[in-house]
Amino acid sequence: MNQIGFKNFRRFKELQPKDLGDITILVGANNAGKSTLVKGLLLILDNLRTLKIGGDSPIFQQPEFRFDANDYHDLGIGTFGRALFNKASKDMISFAVRLTRDLNLMDDSGNTFKRKADFSILIGVTGDKSTDQTTGTISRIWVSDNNRGIKFDFDY
């Protein structure tokens, strides 16, 4: 993962996408958002890994985004209401990530070649902050293949 950003998550109204390196060191005062950045990163990774969609096709079913503990981490967030920025104007959290990776590929003739994969992903999550709801509903998934200019937008 090369970048992360979010809106209305925990203490941040908006965190513009931040570059991440192979090693990233976070430094700041208490309550500056270091843990929030790490929790956001883990939350996105956990949900991308364990995304469960009812039915056969994500196009027709709204997937859920989990805020409670799962098989990988217990981040101490627990509910959509605890994850939502306390001064949010609407009950929606947005997560944005950019993934780049060098790939070694092989064509049909057995020739190998290198290609760089570069994808941007945006996930919009809505929920009810007044309940103990441990999941939010994914209302939008937007994926862009930055190399080819191909974009997919699932607006549930």
Please describe what each predicted stretch is.
Residues 1-156:
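P-loop NTPase switch/coupling surface
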